[in-house]
Amino acid sequence: MFGFFKKDKAVEVEVPTQVPAHIGIIMDGNGRWAKKRMQPRVFGHKAGMEALQTVTKAANKLGVKVITVYAFSTENWTRPDQEVKFIMNLPVEFYDNYVPELHANNVKIQMIGETDRLPKQTFEALTKAEELTKNNTGLILNFALNYGGRAEITQALKLISQDVLDAKINPGDITEELIGNYLFTQHLPKDLRDPDLIIRTSGELRLSNFLPWQGAYSELYFTDTLWPDFDEAALQEAILAYNRRHRRFGGV
């Protein structure tokens, strides 16, 4: 895809002409945002939830089809217990205070990761959100919770190996497409499983085990903006940066 963009002559601002179908977001910087305001880290996580609502509505309006947010990694369990407990309770608050509006805007909510290991109240809140929005046809909001990319691939290989042993598939049948059918993103339409654009906030320049298989050819966008400050204008700027690029997929 050639990343063309145009300028609105009336106001001289760039307007995206290509909107990425699937955007992955590493929502980083909540703790630093809170620290700058002399508040506890959990204060930043709460503000980050507000930012997610804002960005999801903006993306839905722009025509983005999927957003996958890195909400909690398999490595995040090593954080202080109080912080982990607070984060695990956020989906309950999200369901009560934010899901009704997303549902009204036709957003479909799903979760990916090793979700069977989540606390009961966390899993139940997200399951209720999935059930409530399952028939919606707008943007799909994927929550990656207790997610790790290497663990995802490892689990997929184990499942494929078992299916080979059970004679459900032959080794010769194993292709990249088949492996994709065993990953956590298997519920997505095949043409939407891989992010076109991955955004990481807070200035960190790494992917931290986020969608390593699906993101092989994703365009990467890093911004110093802390996640709670990432708003509709910041999303527009990320999409404009995406528009300026030429995706070659190994070609020329």
From Swiss-Prot:
Entry keyword Metal-binding? yes
- The entry's Mg(2+)-binding residues are 28, 219
- What is the top EC class of this enzyme, as a single word? transferase
List, separated by semicolons, the cofactors it needs: Mg(2+)
Function text: Catalyzes the condensation of isopentenyl diphosphate (IPP) with allylic pyrophosphates generating different type of terpenoids.
Please, which domain of life does this record's source organism belong to?
Answer: Bacteria
Cofactor note text: Binds 2 magnesium ions per subunit.
Identify the gene encoding this protein: uppS
Q: Name one GO cellular component term.
A: cytosol
Query: What keyword terms does UniProt attach to this protein?
Result: Magnesium, Metal-binding, Transferase
Q: Which residues of the sequence carry a binding annotation for substrate? A: 29-33, 41, 45, 73-75, 77, 79, 200, 206-208
What protein am I looking at? Isoprenyl transferase
